[in-house]
């Protein structure tokens, strides 16, 4: 089972694409290692860094930075964000 629930799409999240970063809502029980493994397996791009936070609504959000240039744009295009 994947720890990735769905992409987090806001205006601020779209501006992070220029920094080669994407945001996802993830399972609250997942850790950073599981999130990195799932994203790399699903989308085929290496993750450079991951930051997680719990929102006020009780969901867990992960901000992922990618090693390859333009990886975030490619993934966003694949999942239909652009």
From Swiss-Prot:
Superkingdom of the source species: Archaea
One matching Pfam family: Ribosomal_L23
GO biological process: translation
GO MF term list: rRNA binding; structural constituent of ribosome
Coiled coil: none
Keywords, ordered alphabetically: Ribonucleoprotein, Ribosomal protein, RNA-binding, rRNA-binding
Protein name, as recorded: Large ribosomal subunit protein uL23
Organism per entry: Methanosarcina mazei (strain ATCC BAA-159 / DSM 3647 / Goe1 / Go1 / JCM 11833 / OCM 88) (Methanosarcina frisia)
Role noted for this protein: Binds to 23S rRNA. One of the proteins that surrounds the polypeptide exit tunnel on the outside of the ribosome.
UniProt-listed InterPro entries: Nucleotide-bd_a/b_plait_sf, Ribosomal_uL23, Ribosomal_uL23-like, Ribosomal_uL23/eL15/eS24_sf
Assigned protein family: Belongs to the universal ribosomal protein uL23 family.
Subunit details: Part of the 50S ribosomal subunit. Contacts protein L29.
One cellular-component annotation, GO: ribosome
